[in-house]
Amino acid sequence: MAMWVFGYGSLIWKTGFPFDESLPGFIKGYRRVFHQGSTDHRGTPDFPGRTVTLEAAHEEVCCGVAYKITKEEDKRDALLHLEVREKQYDQKEYLDFFTDSNASEPAVAGVMVYIASPDKKSNNNYLGPAPLEDIAKQIVKAKGPSGPNRDYLFNLEEALAQLGFKDKHVTDLANQVRHILSESEELDIDATAATANNV
């Protein structure tokens, strides 16, 4: 029996395990939010980054990619990889996955999804909601073993666009981060010019 894994964050562009088939599509009743703190990939314990998790939202969908794994050895390798990679995500759910918005039946029933819950007892890295500008400022500054937090956001934005998916939260956040970075560059240019004039 095949195992299916749904990716809605970095798994979209960086899978890290063998798979036999990938399907772009969506799950129902959830939305993607930057509410999870990352202290091991895109931030540190002293300054966490922010990565995506899922939040229940009755009328919404979350787009991503489902990966099919059939060989027993590949299943074991995938689970070992995911249990380490997603160790800060405290819930595993098995949800229906759709590829057609008009379909009443799922394309795949029971895709495995890792979710970081808002339960502080089981997930002490949960950061929760915050104003868009505050989240953007945190993402601009955060950096971890897997690289700058902003790269995670921009990679997610690009990966979704390549699949033809739109996610307003991701787009708005990426635009806010770009705005902060452009303002910072302008300040650096002004400071450099002022220093040159004083020489």
UniProtKB/Swiss-Prot annotation:
It catalyses: glutathione = L-cysteinylglycine + 5-oxo-L-proline. Its cofactor is Mn(2+). Substrate binds at V5, F6, G7, Y8, G9, S10. The keyword Transferase does not apply. InterPro entries: ChaC (IPR006840), GGCT-like (IPR013024), GGCT-like_sf (IPR036568). It is found in: Cytoplasm. The keyword Lyase applies. One of its GO terms (cellular component) is cytosol. It holds the Pfam family ChaC. Gene3D superfamilies: Gamma-glutamyl cyclotransferase-like. Binds 2 Mn(2+) ions per subunit. GO terms for molecular function: gamma-glutamylcyclotransferase activity; glutathione specific gamma-glutamylcyclotransferase activity. The active site is at E86 (proton acceptor). Its EC number is 4.3.2.7. One of its GO terms (biological process) is glutathione catabolic process. Keywords: Cytoplasm, Lyase. Converts GSH to 5-oxoproline and cysteine-glycine (Cys-Gly) dipeptide in vitro and plays a significant role in glutathione (GSH) homeostasis. Has no activity towards gamma-glutamyl-L-cysteine but possesses very low activity towards gamma-glutamyl-L-alanine. Belongs to the gamma-glutamylcyclotransferase family. This is Gamma-glutamylcyclotransferase 2-3. It comes from Arabidopsis thaliana (Mouse-ear cress).
